Amino acid sequence: MRIFPLLACCFALSVAAEENFGNLVFSDTFDRKETQKVKDEPGNGWKTSSSWSAKGNKEVDLVDGTMYIYIHPEAIHAVDVGHDFQFIDGTATMRFKFHEAKDTLMLNFADLTLKEVHAGHLCAATFGSKKVTLQDMKTGGMLLKYYDARKAGKLSKEDAEVIKTKVKTIPADISVGEWHSLNVTILGDTMTASVDGKSIGSFSSPGIAHESKQVLRLLVSNKVTLDDVKYYRKK
């Protein structure tokens, strides 16, 4: 078996793919240690929600060169671990591992200066063991007129139908307890998700094309371990 030429070919294809993503603007391999184990201390510019969503309890650990994110029993919101990522078109890549079948990982793109939507939500790709969901939040469920109406129990059937058109759910089979890789690419009004080098699907909607994406928030509903996070800006 001629293994080395095959490995060289795979490496070349990987490099070519990364070059096509654009300029690398952020990366993290989590090869560092925390100074304590009481509060979140992810470092490298990461910000977490635990101070307000989990009464300050720790929800992020750096373990053996990875970032382990887990929700605290007292939490009132999914764990939110965010980092600046300013772009119009770009790609986020990372390795991830689910620990239980119910685990989910959401890549939530946001512009906190945008006041027409709740908490700056623009669009998101959510990965679960059985499905991947692509969503336009800016013109969908997080648009304040919809968000406030739903919260008040006054969302009309017509508006509920509109919101449904802003979400695409795609069946997937992502194993638990094993490492996987993911890519989420945004080009114009289209978001594409891939797992382990295979395209899961794409979704096009106006809110995805928002031209002032500022932050990428990683939201975890239960437990997820991450490594090799990279953000690329194409435009």
Where does each model-flagged region fall?
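Short tryptophan-centered beta-strand motifs in secreted/extracellular beta-sheet-rich domains
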Residues: F30, M94, E178-I186, M191-A193
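Secretory/extracellular carbohydrate-interaction modules
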Residues: Y70-A152
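Hydrophobic h-region of N-terminal signal peptides that target proteins for export
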Residues: A8-A17
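Short, aromatic/His-centered strand-loop micro-motif at the edge of beta-sheets
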Residues: M142-S181
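Extracellular carbohydrate-recognition regions
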Residues: E18-K47
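Short, solvent-exposed beta-strand-to-loop segments that form ligand-recognition rims
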Residues: D196-V215
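Beta-strand-rich interaction surfaces with strong enrichment in secreted/lumenal proteins
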Residues: A78-F85, K168-I174, L216
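Short carbohydrate-recognition loop motifs
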Residues: G56-I76
